[in-house]
Amino acid sequence: MKVKLLLTAITLSCLAIDVLAQVSISGKIVSADTNEPVVGANIRIDQSLSGCTTNDKGEFSISNLPDGKHVLRITHVSYTPKSITTKGGEKNLLIKLQDSFTNIGQVVVTGTGTHHRMTDSPVPVSVITAKDLSNASVTSLDEALQKLTPSFSSMTNGMGTTLSLNGLPDDYFIFLENGKRLYGDDTYARINVAKIKRIEILNGASSALYGTNAIGGVINIITDDVKNAINVSSDTRYASKGRFTQSVNIDVNTGKFGSYTSYRRQQAEGWQLNPYEENSKTHELEETGKVASTGFYANTVNQKFTFDATDKLSFYARGGYYDNKTRRPYEAYDYNILHETFNYGIGAQYMINKGNYITADCYADHFSSSYCFFKDNKTYNGKAGEEQVRKRTRNHNLSIKGIFKLGNRHKLSVGTEYIVDVLKSQTDNIAKEDAYTLALFAQDEIKLLRNLQALIGVRYIYHENFKNHATPNVALMYKPGKFNFRASYAAGFRTPTLSELYATDIAKKNDRLTIGNLDLKPEKNNYFSLSAEYVHERFSVSVNAFYNNIRDMIDYNTIATGDKAMEQYGHKEVRQRDNIAEAKVHGINVSANAYLGAGFNLSGGYTHLTVSYTHLRAHETL
C-alpha cells in the first residue's frame, strides 16, 4: 500500500511539474518595409507539432509548450522565410519579414514526401498559391489548373469536364489532399477552392512514392487549417450561364482542440453549342435539345477535428459528403445522373525528435453513381420516378510511414500501405468484386556534396490479381549558386481497375456493347526528365524536358460486328478492353516569373508536346 501511495504521489508530482512547465509564446509579425501586419503567416515550432497562423492584425499565440528554448520558423507566400530563437515563454515578440517577389521560399512536400524549399527539392515541383487562386478568380480546381499551369488541358462534354496532364487523361495521375490520396470519381470536383493554401504539381511518374496510377503525375492540394481561436469566412461568386458558388468556412481552435468545418454550394445552367445535330440514319440536320455542357447542382461538406495531446503527438478525425446531380433538358433526355461520395478517416502523428517522426492514417471512400429517371427508358429498363444505382465503389486505405534523419547526409522514408477496392454494379450485373494491394516502400535522400544531392527509392507491390511488381526512382540535383540542374528517372505502374476487369457498358448513341477482360495486364512506363532553373530575388526561369514511354496501355479492341455480333451478343458492335497500345510522350515545359515593381508581377508558361500512339496489333473481328 505504501508503495502504491508513493507511486501515485510521484505521478501526480510529475503531472504537476509538467503543467507548471508549460509556457506560451506570442507576438506580432509585420512587413519590414511598411510595418503593416502580415496576415496568414505560418509559424511552426522546430522539433514540435505546434504552430499557428497570424490573424488580421498580424498577431499570433502558441500555448502548451515545454519551457526552454524554441526555434520559430515563419513562412508566407509573399515574404522570405525566417527563423528566430526564443527563450522560454516570451511575449510581445515583434518579427519583421522581408518581401519576396517570387515564390523561391515556398515549402513543398510532394516531390519527396518530405519538406523542402521549392528550390532545394531534388524533384522539380511547381506551386500554385492561394494568392494566385485569388488573383485568377477561379471557382473550381480544374479551372485553376487550366488557367495557371500550361501542362493541363480539359475537355467539356454533356457529362462534365475531364482533365489531362501533359497529354495523359486523369486515369494516369492522382490527386492528394494534404498528402492523402483521393479515390473514386469526381475527385477534383470535391475540393473546396476557398480552403486551398497551395497546390503542388509533380510532373511525371511517381509510383515509387505514391503507388499505382501515379505514372503521369501527382497533384497535392494543401488546405489551410487556420490556427486562430475563431475564424469565419464566406465567399460568393456568380457568373454567366447561372454559374453560382457559395463557400462558408468556420474554424474554431481552443489550443489543444480544433474544429474545421466547410460547406460549398455550386450550380450552373446547361448550354448548347449548336441547336442542331445530324441524324445518324438520314444524315440531315434536325433540332435537338441536347447540351454541350450539362446544368448541375453540387454540395460539399467537410468536417475535421484535431487534438494535440502534446507538442509532439497529435490526432485527427475527418469526414466529408459530396453530391452532384445533373439538370438535363426534359425534351432531350430520359434521366439525370446523381453522384454521391462520403468519406471518413482517422490518423496520428508522433514526432520522435528533430527530423524523425511517424504517421499512421486510416481512410475510407464510398462512391455511388445513379440514374434518376424522369421518363421511361428502354436501355436500362428504367421507369419514370425510379432511381437505379449504376455503380458503387469503396476504397479502404491503411498506411504507416516513418521519416528518419540519419546523420547529416541521409533522410530515410519507409512505410507500408494496404488498400482494398470494392465494386458493385446493378446495371453491369456485378454483385460484388474486390481486390487488395499490399505495398512496401523506402526512399533515401542523400547529400553527396554541399551542392549535390541524390534521391533513390523503390516500392514493392503485391496485388491480389497481378502479384508482384517493383517500381524504382532515381533523382540527382546539382545546385551551383543561383542555378539548379536536375535529372531523374522513374518507373510507373498502373493496375487495371475493377471496372476495366469486370464491367460492361452499352453506348447511349449507338448499338455498341463494351465488355471487361479478366486477362488485362498492368500498364507500365519509364519516365526520364532533365531540367535547369535560374532563381533570382526578382525573377526566375525554368526549363524541363521529359520523355514518357507507356507500355501495355488499355484501349478498346473490336471483337465482333454486324450479323455475327447480333447473333452472339445481341448488339451490332462489340468491343473489349485490352492491352493493345503503346504511347510515347515527350515535350518541354518552360516557365518564367518576374517582379516588375510597384506591385506588378509578370509570369508565363509554355508547354510543347509530341505524342505518338501505336496499336500493337490490328483489331480482331469475327
List each model region and its residues:
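Face-selective signature of the C-terminal outer-membrane beta-barrel domain
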Residues: 306-324, 339-466, 472-479, 539-546, ...
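Extracytoplasmic beta-strand/coil segments of soluble accessory domains associated
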Residues: 125, 142-180
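Short acidic/polar hinge/loop motifs at secondary-structure boundaries
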Residues: 61-64, 153, 180-205
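Gram-negative outer-membrane beta-barrel transporters
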Residues: 408, 447-451, 547-549, 569-617
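N-terminal periplasmic accessory domains that precede
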Residues: 90-96, 141-144, 148, 161-164, ...
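Short, acidic, small-residue-rich periplasmic hinge/interaction motif at the N-terminus
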Residues: 30-34, 41-46, 73-79, 87-134, ...
